[in-house]
Amino acid sequence: GIAFAWKAGQWIDSDINNFKSLLWIFVAVSSLNAIAFWFMPKVETVKGSTNPFSAFKWLKKDKKFRVLIISWMLMGLGNLTALKIWTEYFANDQYGNGFSAFEVTLLTFIIPAGVKIIFTYPWGWLFDRMNFYVLRVILNVIFGAAILVVFYADSFWIIAIGTGLQGLAFAGGGIAWMLWVTKIAPPEHTAEYMSIHTFTTGLRGVVAPALGFYLLVTIGNSIAIFSAILITLASVVLIPEIIRSRKTNQL
């Protein structure tokens, strides 16, 4: 993926119309991915309720789950609001960057993906051994720092450090996103918990890009402050849970 992104960035730099061919490549690869998933062996899981709306009851019944969803919503909205506009921010001369397609590819994929590959295993090791709430706050701090560096840096390589930090945070964030439900959900209700988590992820994923572009046009790089505030709030709401979990030695 990194090697392909490297060549794709150079290819678009040579002729902007090459993006059309790239789109067909993406379609072909996505189709192969879908076929591979189709032939994966079925995994038998503990069956829960089949009512798609019944899962929402856990937001009311389970305080730990509710707090984590609120925290994740704040953090995700803050992070995605900034992240989804990076390509525009890096490529558009209006914001003082005007990087080439290859440079944008370096910043948005090659550097963060490379860092993510390197640090995924260490984060997985920490996930199994560290208090989850503390781990989540550490990840939030790294995400917030990455956004501030990217939007307030004055050189390509300082921005690259920021996108590298984003990759570092995503290495742990990806593991946390996929597995945190297993820390708190009863086995027979894991799918229901995950459905709410996925639903709220999609919700902020729809809102964040539109909000991000609106803020970029109206307040410029101060969008980083907006994101940092939301990410800080996401960490603050976890503090009571950190205290409680340490007293009870849970998570």
Please provide the spans of the model-predicted regions.
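Short amphipathic helix-loop junctions that connect adjacent transmembrane helices
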Residues: 84-104
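Glycine-rich segments within core transmembrane alpha-helices of 12-TM secondary carriers
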Residues: 1-6, 198-208
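Helix-to-loop junctions at the C-terminal end of transmembrane segments
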Residues: 12, 118-131, 216
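Structural signature of the two symmetry-related core transmembrane helices
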Residues: 134-149, 229
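Juxtamembrane intracellular "pre-TM" segments in multi-pass secondary transporters
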Residues: 42-70, 96
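Intracellular juxtamembrane helix-capping segments at the cytosolic ends
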Residues: 172-185
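Loop-to-transmembrane helix entry/capping segments in MFS-fold secondary transporters
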Residues: 101-102, 187-197
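C-terminal membrane-cytosol helix-exit motif in multi-pass small-molecule transporters
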Residues: 27-46, 235-243
